[in-house]
């Protein structure tokens, strides 16, 4: 950067390709100085020796741990030290056609019961309208992320506090059964992924969608590459934004409201240019921070919430940022302060599998091998019952666990 005098080469990598690339680079001794990555991989990489924990922890100390989201630091902690530096995050959302829900007298879809009731009531495949659209692609992390929110909502956990895999628990079987029934009965046919689910909702062909908040600027007609195409959108491009409700957290019959959260961090590769990496990250999270959040405020909530002098400075600045690509607007002016406040409050209560039980390395493994999306697809294809899929998911997770522990 100009400010630090450090020359930076930016290499863009797809999220699904990260695990393999880090392994290849580790083998060839070419780990990146700084790797921007989702928390799914942080603890696993640290325990594999791919991240310089001491270097990252020093950055957090230099910037003051109290200025970061405590939850984000907890997710990235290994043996009492922060393994990578939290940058930003987002919480997954269930969006729904509030106009159609209101007209049908349906409750907001914040529980399994309300979600299924609405999907059944509004599903009309003969007119190309579906109760819900959500990911079912066996090869996509997006399916893991989507299902995990439903699992967490029903208190279906990856492991118990003792580290025993619990994917075959009654709660997990129930979550698998609910999710697959929802998609089998009330969703479009075929493989659904991050692109097709958005396209279906934007075409006005679905009552509900599960997606990240990156959809918010697109739904507000701010990005030409992903424009709403519903019939009403021709005359009113912001029709969907005006008529969609937003649910951050959902609850199943055996759980309490939960929201899947994704935190992005900056890790420092082992045996790399550590001092330059530390200087770059400290600049990124101070003088360069708001410029970074401006890239996509709808999906980049600040995990460094402020400074020692003003603990909420970055949150306050974030609320004023304009989102969009081809057009720009402040999200609060489109969706209202209540929605924005919900996004802010949710950022401190994100839920995830495994991390609080010290299973970050196992999380990294299953996000790489994807036994859960594969199991979901097996049920949808008729190749397994929810009970069989849960047992297979658990068995594959246990195999990963045994490999990691040398058992």
Q: What does each model-found stretch correspond to?
A:
Residues 219-220, 236-238, 253-370:
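C-terminal lobe and pocket-closing loops
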Residues 6, 174-178, 272-284, 389:
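Short amphipathic alpha-helical coupling segments at ligand-binding clamshell hinges
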Residues 3-68, 99-110, 200, 207-208, ...:
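Extracytoplasmic "Venus flytrap"/periplasmic binding protein-like
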Residues 92-96, 151, 266-268:
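Short glycine- and hydrophobic/aromatic-rich loop-to-beta-strand nucleating segment
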Residues 42-46, 213-238:
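A ligand-binding cleft/hinge motif common to bilobed small-molecule-binding domains
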Residues 81-87, 116-164, 194, 198-199, ...:
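Extracytoplasmic/periplasmic solute-binding protein
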Residues 39-91, 143-146, 233-250:
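Hinge/lid segment of periplasmic solute-binding proteins
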Residues 119-121, 162-191, 235-249:
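Glycine-centered hinge/linker elements that transmit conformational signals in sensory
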């Amino acid at each position: 950067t100009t400010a630090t005098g450090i020359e930076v080469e930016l290499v863009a990598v797809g999220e699904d390709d990260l695990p393999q690339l880090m392994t290849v680079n580790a083998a060839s001794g070419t780990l990146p100085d700084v790797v921007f990555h989702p928390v799914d991989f942080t603890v696993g990489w640290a325990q594999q020796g791919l991240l310089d924990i001491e270097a990252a922890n020093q950055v957090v100390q230099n910037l003051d741990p109290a200025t970061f989201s405590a939850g984000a630091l907890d997710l990235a902690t290994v043996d009492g030290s922060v393994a990578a530096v939290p940058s930003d995050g987002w919480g997954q959302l269930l969006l729904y056609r509030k106009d159609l829900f209101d007209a049908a007298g349906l409750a907001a879809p914040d529980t399994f019961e309300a979600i299924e009731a609405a999907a059944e009531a509004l599903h009309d495949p003969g007119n190309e309208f579906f109760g819900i659209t959500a990911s079912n692609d066996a090869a996509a992390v997006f399916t893991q992320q989507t299902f995990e929110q439903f699992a967490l909502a029903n208190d279906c956990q990856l492991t118990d506090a003792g580290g025993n895999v619990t994917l075959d628990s009654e709660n997990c079987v129930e979550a698998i059964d609910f999710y697959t029934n929802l998609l089998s009965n009330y969703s479009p046919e075929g493989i659904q992924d991050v692109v097709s689910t958005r396209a279906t909702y934007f075409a006005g062909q679905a009552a509900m969608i599960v997606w990240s908040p990156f959809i918010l600027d697109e739904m507000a007609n701010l990005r030409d590459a992903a424009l709403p195409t519903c019939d009403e959108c021709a005359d009113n491009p912001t029709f969907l934004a005006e008529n969609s409700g937003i649910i951050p957290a959902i609850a199943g019959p055996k759980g309490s409201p939960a929201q899947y959260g994704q935190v992005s961090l900056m890790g420092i590769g082992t045996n790399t240019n550590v001092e330059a990496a530390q200087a770059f990250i400290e600049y990124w999270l101070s003088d360069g921070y708001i410029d970074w959040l401006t890239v996509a405020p709808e999906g980049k909530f600040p995990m460094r919430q402020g400074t020692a002098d003003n603990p909420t400075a970055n949150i306050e600045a974030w609320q004023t940022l304009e989102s969009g690509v081809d057009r720009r607007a402040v999200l609060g002016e489109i969706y209202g302060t209540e929605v924005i406040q919900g996004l802010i409050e949710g950022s401190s209560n994100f839920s995830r599998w495994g991390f609080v039980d010290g299973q970050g390395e196992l999380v990294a493994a299953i996000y790489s091998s994807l036994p859960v999306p594969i199991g979901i697809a097996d049920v949808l294809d008729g190749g397994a019952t929810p009970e069989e899929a849960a047992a297979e998911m658990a068995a594959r997770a246990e195999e990963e666990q045994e490999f990691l522990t040398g058992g």
